């Protein structure tokens, strides 16, 4: 039966029994003759994770009331009279503490006021003020031309040598340079100049606070950082500063814990969902629920996006399993059948698949149908055609990669990336997030189809996620050639060494970020919060793959951050 032809109240959203249509023995293909996945089991205790849904946390009514009071204090502070540079620095601190979402309108209002102010003496000639102003305005959708930095160049067109001693100015210039577009050569020069000089002085900076900020920035620029992860680090860092604003710090801690308590309940419910699917018993695929929840928090940590996180985590966990079926477990014939079932969005033919794979297919259908049912109930919009199309497109890209591997075909880098920017899978999660958050008056079949068509913003998001994923591939994996990656494609195509290939891919990352930065200012039918989701998924990838594959294998850095962001609340002083 074709799912599109059924009634929304019957088979369209019908939950399929995971025991239905599964051949008892004929489809029970033994795993004995299949390649071993060698995936490590999850290091997370799922009984503990499930308990988070009901466990009382440290956030009580007293703390909630206190947070509300402090929020008003901070709001008054932001609207107060102060020097322009001090106002910019306050906004910067508020954003880095993870509080931007609480003061969105106030931040835009204050920045626009500073932008419209005809007096420019306060920032012209001051590298720190010029760069901080440039970055904050561009971050918040107000365009500033790159030529504001021309004044810091000498007659030969180079950045003035005396700027090498201005560490704070260099740090602000470094952060600003990551907001550049294609063709903005001055910002490219600024990035190179600031990076070189900060690396030269990072071990000899007299101020411990400034030294830590410089090293942190060189490890990962702000524009590439996930807001929630950055906030957890910066709250501790801000507490060390001499000029800390006590009530702002207190509010940041309270708000972090309030949001964390919401995330914990969501995580507990998702852990229960995962166990109830029975997929945790399948030994040939990865269990990545926790990693996907961390990614969900990178994509949209704000409390109002609970449904976005819920869908993203469920889809992400299933996507990983489907990816493992195509990469490791399934035969080419099974993958053809799998792809056909998803393309038709019809479970007829599932009896031709082994039971393990059939369970994954049925869970895919059940989860997509449940998400679609919720959207129809809550928003009056039939999303099944769009979610089904996104799943089908994804599976077709997986199948193409599987055929490349089985036939020994070596695609060019361009050919690989054209397929890979979709096979990285974020289009599916982004389409679903769009359906959940787009304003109802703008949500139409055509608008959803536009997102599914992979427009430029979504394309850059997919490309960057793909490139980061590939850079996380180990040298051993590349040498084995188990899975096709962009690094291998470039090596095969050009004869380059792995080191040279990695540098080339890193260069593509910088160029793709410039394209995405430009997209944020172009006229488009896409709007917030969807635009932000596209950028934030990339920031999640940057974290997981920065030091290797922290997604497939729970490394110490990913587990430590997961504990501090999701499990352990920030300690409050006794008087708090």
Swiss-Prot record:
Pfam families: Terpene_synth (PF01397), Terpene_synth_C (PF03936)
Motif DDXXD motif, residue numbers: 323-327
Cofactor info, note text: Binds 3 Mg(2+) or Mn(2+) ions per subunit.
EC number of this enzyme: 4.2.3.-
Binding site for Mg(2+) 3: 469, 473, 477
Main enzyme class: lyase
Positions that bind Mg(2+) 1: 323, 327
GO MF annotations, alphabetized: magnesium ion binding; terpene synthase activity
Keywords: Lyase, Magnesium, Manganese, Metal-binding
UniProt-annotated binding residues for (2E,6E)-farnesyl diphosphate: 286, 323, 327, 466, 469
Cofactor section: Mg(2+); Mn(2+)
Residues reported to bind Mg(2+) 2: 323, 327
Presence of keyword Iron: no
Biological processes per GO annotation: diterpenoid biosynthetic process
Family listed: Belongs to the terpene synthase family. Tpsb subfamily.
Domain-level remarks: The Asp-Asp-Xaa-Xaa-Asp/Glu (DDXXD/E) motif is important for the catalytic activity, presumably through binding to Mg(2+).
Function according to Swiss-Prot or TrEMBL: Produces a mixture of beta-bisabolene and alpha-bisabolol, along with traces of alpha-bisabolene and farnesene isomers from (2E,6E)-farnesyl diphosphate in fragrance biosynthesis.
Protein name in the entry: Alpha-bisabolol synthase
Species per Swiss-Prot/TrEMBL record: Santalum spicatum (Australian sandalwood)
């Amino acid at each position: 039966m074709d799912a599109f032809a059924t009634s929304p109240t019957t088979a369209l959203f019908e939950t399929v029994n995971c025991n239905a249509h599964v051949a008892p023995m004929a489809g029970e293909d033994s795993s004995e003759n299949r390649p071993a996945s060698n995936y490590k089991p999850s290091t997370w205790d799922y009984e503990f994770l499930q308990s988070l849904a009901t466990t009382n946390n440290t956030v009580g009514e007293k703390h909630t009331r206190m947070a509300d009071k402090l929020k008003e204090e901070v709001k008054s502070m932001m609207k107060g009279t102060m020097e322009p540079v001090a106002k910019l620095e306050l906004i910067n601190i508020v954003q880095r503490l993870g509080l931007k979402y609480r003061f969105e309108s106030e931040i835009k209002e204050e920045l626009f006021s500073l932008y419209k102010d005809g007096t420019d003496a306060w920032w012209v000639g001051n590298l720190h003020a010029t760069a901080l102003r440039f970055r904050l305005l561009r971050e918040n959708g107000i365009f500033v031309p790159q030529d504001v930095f021309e004044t810091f160049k000498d007659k030969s067109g180079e950045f003035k040598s005396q700027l090498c001693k201005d560490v704070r100015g260099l740090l602000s210039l470094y952060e600003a340079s990551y907001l550049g577009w294609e063709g903005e050569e001055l910002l490219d020069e600024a990035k190179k100049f600031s990076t070189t000089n900060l690396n030269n002085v990072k071990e000899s900076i007299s101020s411990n606070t400034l030294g830590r900020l410089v090293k942190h920035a060189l490890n990962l620029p702000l524009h590439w950082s996930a807001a929630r992860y950055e906030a957890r680090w910066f709250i501790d860092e801000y507490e060390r500063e001499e000029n800390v604003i006590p009530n702002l710090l207190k509010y940041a801690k309270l708000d972090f814990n309030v949001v964390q308590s919401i995330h914990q309940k969501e995580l507990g419910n998702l852990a229960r969902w995962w166990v109830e699917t029975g997929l945790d018993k399948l030994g040939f695929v990865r269990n990545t629920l926790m990693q996907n929840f961390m990614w969900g928090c990178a994509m949209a940590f704000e409390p109002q996006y609970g449904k976005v996180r819920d869908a993203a985590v469920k889809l992400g966990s299933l996507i990983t399993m489907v990816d493992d079926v195509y990469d490791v477990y399934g035969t080419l014939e099974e993958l053809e059948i799998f792809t056909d079932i998803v393309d038709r969005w019809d479970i007829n033919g599932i009896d031709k698949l082994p039971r393990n794979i059939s369970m994954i297919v049925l869970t895919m259908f059940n989860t997509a149908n449940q998400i679609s049912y919720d959207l129809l109930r809550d928003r009056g919009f039939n999303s099944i055609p769009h979610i089904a199309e996104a799943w089908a497109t994804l599976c077709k890209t997986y199948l193409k990669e599987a055929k490349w591997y089985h036939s020994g075909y070596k695609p060019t880098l361009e050919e690989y990336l054209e397929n890979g920017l979709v096979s990285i899978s974020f289009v599916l999660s982004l389409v679903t997030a769009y359906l959940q958050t787009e304003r109802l008056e703008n949500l139409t079949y055509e608008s959803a189809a536009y997102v599914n068509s992979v427009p430029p913003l979504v394309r850059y998001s997919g490309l960057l996620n793909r490139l980061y994923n590939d850079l996380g591939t180990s040298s051993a994996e590349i040498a084995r050639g188990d899975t096709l990656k962009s690094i291998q494609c470039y090596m095969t195509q050009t004869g380059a060494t792995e080191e040279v290939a990695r540098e080339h891919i890193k260069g593509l990352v910088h160029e793709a970020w410039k394209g995405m930065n430009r997209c944020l200012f172009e006229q488009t039918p896409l709007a917030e919060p969807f635009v932000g989701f596209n950028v934030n998924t990339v920031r999640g990838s940057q974290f997981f793959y920065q030091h290797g594959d922290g997604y497939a294998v729970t490394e110490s850095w990913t587990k430590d951050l997961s504990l501090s962001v999701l499990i352990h609340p920030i300690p409050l002083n006794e008087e708090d």
